[in-house]
């Protein structure tokens, strides 16, 4: 992962937000210069065209000068040609810069997502995270790019128009200056409202994404439970909230523009009245008076555009705060330097307790256990007893107290994360499959380069070939998104083949066969037998009939180890384990 975000100062205010955002644009200095030059040229030409009204009226029409009109005809074509080149150059350069910045920030956000600790995902909805990467990145770049374009283009137009007005009549121009402080006051008031609404709009967009994602993920359950009406009503409420926030934003924008234009119209009316005074009227030619009126009317559009900058900036600032706060999140704690060797690892849990963040009830309490390398150990207990927590802590998905878990007499936090996890192969009910071939799914996540023959051998050992040979392209057949074309048992066998190829020293089986039929389970058990030979095996099981062969069974209840022994020993005790066994 490229840690670009770590080198940029954390934002503590709008000034720092702008500074941090500028760091993404800084690498495109030459393109920015070209874009700015194109914008300025476009604006200068666009506004400057009005100046030709004066000679065309005073010379071409009033004095019937055909040469002036002919020259004007040539200039119109030349001016629009120059205007077109400037428009294309600036638009393309700005679009290119904006797309590169969006790409870079989105990639950083996605990379950050991959390195965040598990606790972050427990406390934040998937919809809000998706919204950050898709919506916020686009909003951030587009808002600031749009604001910069408007600020430069319209400012140059205003400057050119204002200069022409002053040159032709400073008295009439002075009237227009009266409205500037009033417009500034309106913009300031509107800005505060934009900021508040933009924040609410962003949150509501995240809720829409979250509801949509949940509906897609749980589509089957929604249909089977016949809750479509209820889910639709919940989404309608969230969707309507998003619409209302958007309408508030649009209403604020819509009312600010007419107010600004109304104030400007009073200034134009005052100009017309002042121009009727003889002293002023005598100083004006028909061309200069027409030029001033056109210029004043033309000023309304850039003034209106400038008033909209706040809306763009506030959207961008809200997105920037959200994204930069996300990019500054602490990544997984990884300061270990030791390397875990590929041996039959001994594991020791040293009398520790663990509570998930945001919870008050401990998931594990005063837990102590020693597991000898090369043995198979099963953890049993009711749902929520703490079985899966042990596996998560071993893999350091969550941080256990220091020195509380040791592998080969070394605390797991002293190993580097990559070295630690390389020696674990994890097989569970929830199989992660990619939209690719069977072969690529088997080799997915392997920490070394593998050959086609190794993949095929793993497929044979995991009984994948039993169904792969029936597919048109065998192991090179596509399995569809998340393996939608496969059964549960077939998906499970791919996971086992993947674990075999990984060749780790510790195997974790998290209820790997609990949801399978007898035929599928037979194939899986055969594959698991091959997978777990000469390995340290940890089994998290609900189906107690599948663990009678293990070396040791650990019985957990409410986070505490209450019984320990093999199947026969625990049966003889007639305790908690026996009651669990009989209940099945």
Swiss-Prot record:
It is found in: Cell inner membrane. GO terms for molecular function: ABC-type transporter activity; ATP binding; ATP hydrolysis activity; ATPase-coupled lipid transmembrane transporter activity. It is an enzyme of class 7 (translocase). Its EC number is 7.5.2.6. PROSITE patterns: ABC_TM1F, ABC_TRANSPORTER_1, ABC_TRANSPORTER_2, MSBA. It is a multi-pass membrane protein. ATP binds at residues 381-388. GO terms for cellular component: plasma membrane. Its main location: membrane. InterPro entries: AAA+_ATPase (IPR003593), ABC1_TM_dom (IPR011527), ABC1_TM_sf (IPR036640), ABC_transporter-like_ATP-bd (IPR003439), ABC_transporter-like_CS (IPR017871), ABC_transpr_lipidA (IPR011917), P-loop_NTPase (IPR027417), Type_1_exporter (IPR039421). Keywords: ATP-binding, Cell inner membrane, Cell membrane, Lipid transport, Membrane, Nucleotide-binding, Translocase, Transmembrane, Transmembrane helix, Transport. It catalyses: ATP + H2O + lipid A-core oligosaccharideSide 1 = ADP + phosphate + lipid A-core oligosaccharideSide 2. The chain crosses the membrane at residues 32-52, 68-88, 146-166, 167-187, 254-274, 280-300. Residues 347-583 form the ABC transporter domain. Residues 33-315 form the ABC transmembrane type-1 domain. Involved in lipopolysaccharide (LPS) biosynthesis. Translocates lipid A-core from the inner to the outer leaflet of the inner membrane. Transmembrane domains (TMD) form a pore in the inner membrane and the ATP-binding domain (NBD) is responsible for energy generation. In MsbA the ATP-binding domain (NBD) and the transmembrane domain (TMD) are fused. Belongs to the ABC transporter superfamily. Lipid exporter (TC 3.A.1.106) family. Homodimer. This is ATP-dependent lipid A-core flippase 2. The lineage of its organism: Bacteria, Pseudomonadati, Pseudomonadota, Gammaproteobacteria, Alteromonadales. The gene is msbA2.
């Amino acid at each position: 992962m490229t840690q670009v975000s770590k080198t940029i100062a954390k934002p503590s205010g709008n000034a720092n937000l702008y500074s941090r955002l500028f760091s993404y644009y800084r690498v495109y200095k030459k393109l920015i210069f070209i874009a700015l030059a194109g914008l300025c040229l476009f604006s200068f030409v666009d506004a400057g065209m009005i100046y030709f009204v004066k000679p065309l009226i005073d010379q071409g029409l009033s004095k019937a000068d055909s040469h002036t009109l002919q020259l004007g005809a040539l200039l119109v074509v030349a001016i629009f040609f120059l205007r077109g080149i400037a428009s294309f150059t600036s638009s393309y350069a700005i679009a290119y810069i904006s797309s590169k910045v969006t790409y870079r920030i989105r990639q950083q956000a996605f990379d950050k997502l991959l390195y965040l600790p598990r606790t972050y995902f427990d406390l934040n909805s998937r919809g809000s995270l998706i919204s950050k990467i898709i919506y916020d990145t686009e909003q951030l770049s587009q808002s600031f790019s749009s604001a910069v374009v408007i600020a430069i283009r319209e400012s140059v137009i205003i400057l050119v128009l204002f200069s022409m007005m002053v040159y032709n009549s400073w008295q009439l121009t002075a009237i227009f200056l009266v409205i500037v402080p009033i417009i500034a006051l309106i913009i300031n008031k509107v800005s505060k409202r934009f900021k508040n609404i933009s924040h609410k709009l962003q949150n509501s967009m995240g809720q829409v994404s979250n509801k949509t994602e949940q509906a897609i993920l749980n589509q089957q359950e929604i249909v089977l439970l016949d809750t479509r009406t209820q889910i639709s009503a919940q989404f309608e409420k969230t969707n309507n909230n998003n619409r209302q926030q958007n309408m508030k934003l649009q209403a604020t924008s819509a009312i600010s523009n007419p107010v600004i234009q109304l104030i400007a119209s009073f200034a134009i009316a005052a100009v017309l009245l002042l121009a009727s005074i003889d002293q002023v009227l005598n100083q004006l030619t028909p061309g200069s008076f027409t030029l001033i009126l056109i210029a004043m009317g033309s000023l309304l559009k850039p003034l209106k555009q400038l008033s909209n900058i706040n809306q763009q900036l506030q959207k961008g600032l809200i997105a920037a705060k959200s994204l930069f706060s996300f990019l500054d999140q602490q990544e997984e704690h990884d300061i270990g330097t030791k390397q875990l060797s590929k041996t039959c690892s001994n594991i020791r849990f040293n009398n520790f307790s663990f509570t998930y963040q945001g919870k008050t009830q401990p998931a594990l309490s005063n837990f102590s256990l020693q597991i000898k390398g090369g043995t198979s150990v099963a953890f049993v207990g009711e749902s929520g007893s703490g079985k899966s927590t042990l596996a998560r802590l071993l893999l350091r998905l969550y941080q256990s107290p220091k020195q509380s878990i040791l592998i080969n007499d070394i605390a797991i936090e002293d190993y580097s994360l990559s070295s630690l996890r390389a020696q674990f192969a994890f097989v569970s009910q929830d199989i992660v499959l990619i939209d690719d071939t069977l072969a690529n799914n088997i080799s997915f996540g392997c920490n070394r380069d593998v050959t086609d023959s190794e993949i095929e051998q793993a497929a044979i050992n995991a009984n994948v070939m039993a169904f792969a040979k029936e597919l048109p392209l065998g192991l090179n057949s596509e399995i569809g998104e998340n393996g939608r074309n496969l059964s549960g048992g077939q998906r499970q066998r791919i996971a086992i083949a993947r674990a075999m190829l990984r060749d780790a020293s510790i195997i974790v089986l998290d209820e790997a066969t609990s949801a399978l039929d007898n035929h599928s389970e037979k194939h899986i058990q055969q594959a698991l037998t091959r997978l777990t030979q000469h390995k340290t095996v940890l089994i998290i099981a609900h189906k107690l009939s599948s663990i009678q062969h293990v070396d040791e069974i650990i019985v957990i209840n409410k986070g505490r180890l209450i019984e320990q022994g093999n199947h026969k020993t625990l049966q003889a005790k007639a305790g908690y384990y026996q009651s669990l066994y009989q209940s099945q």
